[in-house]
UniProtKB/Swiss-Prot annotation:
This is Telomerase-associated protein of 50 kDa. One of its GO terms (cellular component) is telomerase holoenzyme complex. It comes from the Eukaryota. The lineage of its organism: Eukaryota, Sar, Alveolata, Ciliophora, Intramacronucleata. It is found in: Chromosome, Telomere. Component of the telomerase holoenzyme complex, composed of the catalytic core (the catalytic subunit TERT, the telomerase RNA template component TER and TAP65/p65), which is associated with two heterotrimeric subcomplexes: (i) the replication protein A (RPA)-related subcomplex, composed of TEB1, RPA2/TEB2 and RPA3/TEB3 and (ii) the CST-like subcomplex, composed of TAP75/p75, TAP45/p45 and TAP19/p19. TEB1 and the CST-like subcomplex are tethered to the catalytic core by TAP50/p50. The keyword Manganese does not apply. Disruption phenotype: Critically short telomeres. Keywords: Chromosome, Telomere. One of its GO terms (biological process) is telomere maintenance via telomerase. Tethering component of the holoenzyme telomerase ribonucleoprotein (RNP) complex. Telomerase is an essential ribonucleoprotein enzyme that copies new telomeric repeats onto chromosome ends by repetitively synthesizing the short telomere-repeat sequence 5'-TTGGGG-3' using an RNA template component TER. In the telomerase holoenzyme complex, acts as a hub that anchors the two heterotrimeric subcomplexes with the catalytic core.
């Protein structure tokens, strides 16, 4: 974990304060395994949480919050730890949140949290990045590891500090970005050195807090750091650390190159295995397809045989059917001729019957006509007789009328003779 402090005086005061706190805790609680309560008095109320990422520390999630009595309470599972710092001089209000490893920070305000495993204290330094700078809004988390048997295993600082820290905000921000990039690419070392070379800019130092089991590079860097600590972190120390960091990065790069070669070979072998596996799978697939084709060919041959047999049966059936149809047609023709003869005979008989019926009908008609003629003749004679009788009566009546008129004329007076028109 990378850590950045500002000032030798602050560094010394911080170290003395931590040592005093540890001694106080150790004198008060001889059996550290039984410790369950620490108190921490702070200058301001705060709310934060933290998830421990170090395997040698608490692995459970740690949640902390300030109670009404301004006490910091840490919770790990079912166990609660309340941390208490009696010395308020080094405490200031702070903010806290999760950050990835290798975070580089600039300390301005801070507070502490403490928890332990077995005989080792984990002292966390909670740092508030400068709130007055809009471009820096991130809050970083840094830690100091302490062990009773080996003392302070790692700490770091910057050799300059200014009360006018706001004037250096842009330089601090740029230096932080460069240091972050340094962890990935050593080409920024010269740029970093040039940016820290000027006395008008704050000088930054790289630091690694070490675990109990250090590798060779960590041990060398630890000795280099101790030498720089004796030299009060002068410019020569800065150059030595930068040069050593450059060498370490080269070693890491070479190691990475070797690892890349090995990884490349492993990748090639893996790809060959995958290719071989794919080839085997392809062969199996082709074999399956060939088997399917063979089965389809057998099926097609079977279908062709069945089709030929069906065609033969159809031809035989059609031949038999044609023969049977011819016989049926001849038989039908014969039956038709026979039927025609019967029909002709029936028609002839019917004609004779009809002829007889017509003759009888004609006779009846003639008889009826004769009867009607006779009847009409009788009626006509009767009518003539009646007419003659009527005419005779009318003539007689006329004669009578004429007679009467003559009689009347004969007996009229003489004076009426002048009016006669006869």
């Amino acid at each position: 974990m990378k850590l950045l402090l500002q000032n030798q005086n602050i560094f010394q005061k911080l170290k003395n304060t931590l040592n005093g706190c540890i001694k106080k805790f150790y004198d008060t609680y001889q059996d550290l395994e039984q410790m369950q309560k620490f108190e921490m008095i702070v200058e301001d109320k705060l709310l934060f949480r933290y998830s421990c990422s170090q395997s040698e520390m608490f692995s459970a999630q740690i949640q902390a919050h300030y109670l009404e009595k301004r006490v910091l309470q840490l919770t790990d599972g079912n166990v609660k730890y309340i941390v208490n710092f009696r010395d308020k001089g080094v405490l200031d209000k702070a903010n806290f949140f999760d950050t990835p490893n290798n975070s580089l920070v600039i300390i301005r305000q801070w507070s502490y949290e403490i928890y332990y495993t077995k005989n080792t204290f984990q002292i966390n330094l909670v740092i508030d990045e400068m709130r007055c700078i809009d471009i820096i809004t991130t809050i970083f988390y840094c830690k100091l590891e302490l062990d009773f048997t080996q003392g302070i295993k790692g700490i770091s600082k910057s050799s300059s500090f200014s009360n006018q820290i706001y004037e250096y905000s842009a330089q601090y921000y740029k230096a932080i970005q460069l240091l972050k990039k340094l962890l990935i690419n050593d080409s920024y070392i010269s740029e970093l050195y040039n940016s820290t070379k000027s006395k008008q800019q704050p000088r930054l130092f790289i630091f690694q807090s070490f675990k109990p089991k250090m590798n060779l590079a960590e041990q060398n860097l630890s000795r280099q750091f101790e030498q720089c600590q004796q030299d009060d972190f002068g410019d020569g120390c800065l150059l030595q650390i930068v040069n050593y960091t450059h060498q370490s990065l080269k070693q890491i790069e070479n190691k990475n190159n070797s690892n890349q070669i090995v990884n490349g070979q492993n990748e090639i072998s893996k790809k060959k295995r995958v290719l071989k596996s794919n080839e085997d799978l392809y062969k199996i697939s082709l074999q399956k397809q060939l088997k399917i084709f063979q089965e389809e060919e057998i099926e097609l041959h079977s279908q062709s045989t069945i089709r030929n047999q069906t065609n033969q049966q159809l031809e035989t059936f059609e031949s038999d059917t044609s023969k049977r149809n011819s016989e049926k047609i001849l038989h039908s023709i014969n039956e038709l001729n026979t039927s025609k003869q019967k029909v002709n005979q029936m028609n002839s008989s019917q004609h004779q019957i009809q002829k007889l019926e017509n003759n009888n009908l004609n006779k009846n008609i003639l008889n009826q006509i004769n009867e009607n003629d006779i009847k009409n003749e009788l009626e006509e004679r009767q009518q003539q007789h009646l007419t003659q009788s009527f005419n005779s009566k009318a003539q007689l009546k006329k004669i009578i009328t004429l007679k009467k008129n003559q009689d009347i004329l004969l007996f009229k007076p003489q004076e009426q003779e002048g009016s006669k028109k006869y």
